[in-house]
Amino acid sequence: MDLITAAAGRGREYGAVERAGYTHWAPTAVARTGLGGSADRRVGAAGRGGAVRSLSAMELSTGLSVRVTHAYNGVTRVSDGTLDSGGHLMQRRDVLRLSALAGAAGVLTLDPMTFTQADAAGTADGPEQTRTLSGHLPTGAPDFVYVPVEVPRGVREIAVSYSYDKPTVPAGTQGNACDIGIFDERGTELGGRGFRGWSGGARTEFAISAEEATPGYLAGPVKAGTWHVVLGPYTVAPQGLDYKITVTLRYGAPGTTPEQGAYPPQRAKGRGRAWYRGDSHLHTVHSDGKRTPAEVVAAARAAGLDFITTTEHNTISSHTAFEGLWGDDLLILTGEEITTRNGHVVALGTDPGVFIDWRYRARDNRFGQFARKVRQAGGLVIPAHPHGTCVGCNWKFGFNEADAVEVWNADFTPDDEITISEWDNTLVAASRGDGRWLPAVGHSDAHREPQVVGLPQTVVLADDLSRTALQEGIRAGRSWIAESSKIDLTFEAVGGRGKHAGIGERLKVGGAAEVTVRLKVSGVGSGCSVRFITDQGQLYGTPVPDSGELSAEWRTTASYAAYVRAEVRRAPADGGASGIPGPMAAMTNPIWLGER
């Protein structure tokens, strides 16, 4: 590494400078520049290094403007840049983008990684070329950092690996976490056609060819043009994030893309109009899950489910991965968990092969656009775990575009309690004519053992076991949630002259007319209790016998209770001393009372 002593600059010494993240161009000269960008002070020659560092007791000036002259294969180019707090060179264009993140999600595009076409390209076992790129991202980096990759003709396979540092951080601060994905030559336009895969932080490497692709990625020809590896620095440590990306192009005959795998059928045999049990938030090895599709299906059947939905994080590669796993007893729907930095949303039952983009925040005002895309693709928009405690899980987009809301996610926890309380407040508002009500659903969000597929599950009254019928039932609120298929219940409200309403329906009676509310529940075990919740709060409660079976009846009027819903709760851990109810075993959507 060359040492440079400034001809003017009070004798400060600077180490070698290299364009951050562009390691195959060797810096040959460094100059300090003024505000106008012209090279006004020669610093000296530079060798390889990766950052500007103090090689003696020097003060490193953050914000120092520099111009680096690079040479590669006889070609010379110039990069203007600014030093960050770690002495890393950031291109001037990148600095401007880092300081203006008002655009969609904040984007930084680096200079391209270039390859030369191999002489033996097109042969069955052609050569391969590898480029490695290193760089540094400061705290406050954009959500997405794009690395253009110039792919020449004759490439059979593109393979990418990456790593980043994970330094110890002060208590109360986030460490480094960085996702990865790729877009092909069709571009990175939001909602465009260039998406070829995403693995989040679940993998450190992936490969794509015509014949096959790593789970989470889409197989297909590797066409010439500008591809983009995309980094998603989810959280960045106070020290910043040092990353390294390696791209390998393998040349040879392109191969043949296999015929597209069969998508799941949209109807199963079913039982006609009936209650169907399902889990519509599930992950496999196609995102950050550990189960294979076959293992998920086996677990679903063991849980007594009638339908499931595959919902991988920001990818649709699983849509063809369930071929041969469905049957008369199990309907498999396709979808996606759209995983943004401001909350996650389940796209339930979208058309197979339809990808929904995730690269936006609430401040970008783009969610409505993509919620409409979900519905155009035949899906439902269901915010997931709105009060989840993981980074980026908290829901920030509001509920105006939602078709339902996931109020119970996996094992019942305090964030589910908060979500249910918030949801119940929306029911109260809707009962007074302030907005519409959203049906509640529950899903397991199961990723791996010991997480249980079907805990919880949504039980839907549908005309048959089909995508359309199930979605109609969910959208109408004709559903309830249970922790397992061992639990069964019926819930109804009955008025005079034979009037009757079930879950999600309205019993149209006068305000003073007597209404009888009936619940039958079984399979809940001992120690549980039943609660009837209305717009006035809890108005009825009773313990469940040790047999786990109960028939409960309560009388009210529409003027006293605008709606009623049922909860079956397990005993609280503290015996009820705190007044906080125990975990949920089952819950229903409301039955509405009154003419309006």
Q: Predicted segment positions?
A:
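C-terminal segment of N-terminal export signals and the immediately downstream linker at the start
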Residues: 110-136
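Noncatalytic modules at the cell exterior or secretory-pathway interfaces
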Residues: 158, 219-238, 561-563
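A metal-dependent hydrolase metal-coordination microenvironment
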Residues: 262-401, 406-425, 429, 435-450, ...
